[in-house]
Amino acid sequence: MSKWKKFTSACLVAALSTALLAGCGGEKKDSAAANADKYVIGASFELTGNVANYGKSTLSGLKLAVDQVNKAGGVNGKQLVVVESDNKSEPAESGNSVTKLITQDKVVAVVGPATSGCVFAATPVVTSNKVPLIAPCATAPAITVDNGQVKEFIFRACFIDPFQGRVMAEFADKTLGVKNVAILHDASSDYSKGLAEVFEKTLNEKGGKVVAKEAFLSKDIDFKAALTKIKAANPEAIYIPGYYEEVAKIIKQTREIGLNVPLIGCDGWDSPKLVEIAGPEALNNTYFSSAFSVQDQTESVQKFIADYKAMYQKDPDIFCMQGYNAGLVLADALKRAGDGADGAKLAAAIAATKDLPVASGKLTYDKDHNPIISAIIIEMKDGVQSFKEKISL
């Protein structure tokens, strides 16, 4: 999930070119054979650039999973080795990052990138080389399915955008008890537009109504004109699907004009920067969908939190958890595929994952390579995240 979900044709051309170069560089050695004494896992993440926080967090979770697997004896008698590659938060660089991991480091699979745009750009490369890729937190539906066709080598470890859009409409209807809702979305983000569309459709199905719908653009800083129009429509709540950079400013300005209705959003809100920019008081009576909360008392969640804190001396966030889950999925699939399995056999093993114990509970893949999981609703109280409820649809 991220603002890089805008998958431009230029990015596709760059990625396709990279994939062709990867395929034309002479005979490609089988990646498993090249590292006979270990399994090398490629970690292509946003380690610098605009969304480096996402990439670094996700990578930390992956490393924890690998550390635990190795300490338990590894997989098929081999240790797992993570090779990092920085895609610089740029879709155009993502293809280069993954190409290097496949052609030079001979990885058996790729975990990452964190953002949908970078995953889209990496997809032609891994597909042409028949190397599975698990995207820990890329939520765009088209990541795993293109025009009804499931992508054989692409998987994810998070819920998809339509799911969290429906979840928040359910929350608005059942928990908040509101029917008249305004929407303020980012017209420059496929992520935001997609969430707004699904939320509105689901709300209408439940007998609700969108009384105002306004838009902004990424990097905007003044939202009061749109908010004034929304205020005039007298909404009972406002749905703001977007990223913390803009959302924090929107929340602050919403309160400044005296609009104190509940504000609800999505997993793009999840960042400490949200509190820094908006301020703790403005965030009261706000809620967003996520897949993780440190206050979730589920046994598997609390064990993951304790293990993560023991390794990193701080609490994990949603991205850490999703990276961790992706690592466990890959390790389990490597074991079931067997030593020496090629990319197609490994991909089939990933697709067959069923009831695998992970941080969030038990993970099973559906036919579209998406995990079947629940959503968490986070409530902000004086700048602190609070577990509100868990929703399964």
Map each language-model feature to its residues.
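Short, low-complexity disordered leader/linker segments with a strong preference
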Residues: 1-40, 71, 392-393
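Beta-alpha junction/loop-to-helix N-cap segments that form part of ligand/metal-binding clefts
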Residues: 28, 54-58, 68, 72-145, ...
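Extracytoplasmic "Venus flytrap"
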Residues: 35, 39-63, 85-92, 114-115, ...
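An alpha-beta-alpha
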Residues: 47, 151-214, 237, 330
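Hydrophobic alpha-helical segments within soluble ligand-binding/sensing domains
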Residues: 94, 157-180, 193-195, 222-224, ...
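Extracellular/periplasmic bilobed ligand-binding domains
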Residues: 126, 196-289
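Extracellular/periplasmic periplasmic-binding protein-like sensory domains
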Residues: 251-324, 379, 384-392
